[in-house]
Amino acid sequence: MTSQVSLREADDIARARRTARTLKTVLALVFLGLGGWCVLAPGMVETLALREEYRHLSPTSALLLQCFGAQAVLVGSLALLSRFTAITFLVFGLLASVPFFVFNVWFVWVSEMFTAWMLLDFAGNASFFLIGIIGWRLMRGETEPV
């Protein structure tokens, strides 16, 4: 009976680790996708995301969006290549989402600078929060990172 319980526990641990690894990859892909979009098509991002009265569509605004996107690509690359522990998931989930929720609320709903397209950013931030919490729960008690 104990060997069956041990096998079941080992299977549960392996499944949790696979899920955590998949979540880490999804987190990285969100950063890489949205960041890459800013790098490769800053004019499109500016046109879709900013209300007309705030659009500049200048080389400077394109450069700023590309810098923003490059930082997201860097974070996505690091997330993809790094090994996450439970604490990494938790800290990443909180730091990669909570400050940006404040940003989204302020600039989408309070100052109304952004269009509804900016809800893609909000969805990305929500995914970071959920992935961080779920990854943390899956990896609690694990000593080997994924």
Q: What are these regions, as identified by a protein language model?
A:
Residues 2-34:
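Cytosolic juxtamembrane helix and N-cap/initiation of the first transmembrane helix
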Residues 7-17, 44-62:
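Interfacial loop at the N-terminal end of multi-pass membrane proteins
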Residues 13, 76-91:
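Juxtamembrane helix-break-helix junctions at the cytosolic face
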Residues 28-47:
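Transmembrane alpha-helix/helix-exit interface in multi-pass inner-membrane proteins
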Residues 32-34, 59-81, 95-98:
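Core segments of alpha-helical transmembrane spans in multipass integral membrane proteins
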Residues 90-106, 126-131:
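Hydrophobic alpha-helical membrane segments
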Residues 102-120:
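Membrane-helix boundary connector in multi-pass membrane proteins
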Residues 126-146:
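Membrane-water interface at the C-terminal end of transmembrane alpha helices
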